[in-house]
Amino acid sequence: MRLEQLQAALRVAETGSFQEAAQKVGCNQSTISRQVKGLEDELGIALFRRQGRMKLTAAGERLLPRLRRICQEWQTACTEIEELLTGRQTELCMAIADSIGGCYLPAVLNRFQQQWPSIHLRVSTLGSDRALKVLRDGLIDLAIVMDSPTLTTSAGLVVDLLLEEEVQVLLSVDHPLADQKAIAWEQLSHVPQVVFKDGYGMQRLVEQRFRELGLELNSCLELNSLDSFRGVVREGYWLALLPQAALVDARHDPRLVIRPTAEPRLTRRIKLVIPEEQLSLPPVRHFRQLCREAMTAELCDFKTLSQLF
């Protein structure tokens, strides 16, 4: 049973004539007749009385309401898909890491909204692991996350490197290490640290660096809010290793200081992840282009970014 057969039967029922039905859909009469006959053969019963004007049989009368619903649903589906393909979707959903959303993304969102004012933006702040899961589940259109080993093995995903930024040390002005110009990893291993919760890319990145250096990470507290990080570090007991984007507000806090680590320096890579099929949608393609323009080599200098955002 094919959609064309159902549409042909509906047109004949509406017009009462093979000829008029053919004119309505723009094909010849024999095509309509063949499609209706094929449907009747498949159902095993006649749908029309073929004497004079075509009239529905009892079976045809029962089928007619369903024919209308099926054909209407198909037309609605075609219209909605056309709207997507021509950029007339109503919303764009994305998930981002907390530190990215507050620093790098506002200008991109602003430019996108100015150019696509009819699209409602939905931005969720999630850890990288969770963001990738909801992306794969089809609940969002795109994600901006930290680099992950799983990204290199993810079929069907288009992955763009947006930027690479340094991870630095956030301390209280009263912390014993605050006077140092750069803090050695050996020293960091002996002081209590605040880290991101499990499932956040930053936690894995920091843990991996300590393992590579043969050191132990002294993590004493897990958080997932940048405000909470700043609050507990102000108390002077803990310190935190955070990416530059997460340190924008801390730079203006007189009770906090930021120091680089000694060599080897640690960086994190931020990537835009989009399912391949989503790139057929104009708003998604345009958002991708805006992200790539915003994260050019000139804008990836942190001092420039901190002034812009």
Swiss-Prot record:
Keywords: Activator, DNA-binding, Transcription, Transcription regulation
GO terms assigned for molecular function: DNA binding; DNA-binding transcription factor activity
InterPro entries: HTH-type_LysR_regulators, LysR_subst-bd, Tscrpt_reg_HTH_LysR, WH-like_DNA-bd_sf, WH_DNA-bd_sf
GO annotations of cellular component type: cytosol
Residue ranges occupied by any HTH lysR-type domain in the UniProt entry: 1-57
TM segment ranges: none
Pfam families given in the database record: HTH_1, LysR_substrate
Keyword DNA-binding applies: yes
CDD domains, per database record: PBP2_LTTR_substrate
DNA-binding region: 18-37
Record function comment: Seems to regulate utilization of fixed nitrogen by controlling the expression of a certain gene(s) involved in nitrogen metabolism.
Family affiliation: Belongs to the LysR transcriptional regulatory family.
Stated name of the protein: Probable nitrogen assimilation transcriptional activator
Organism annotation: Synechococcus elongatus (strain ATCC 33912 / PCC 7942 / FACHB-805)
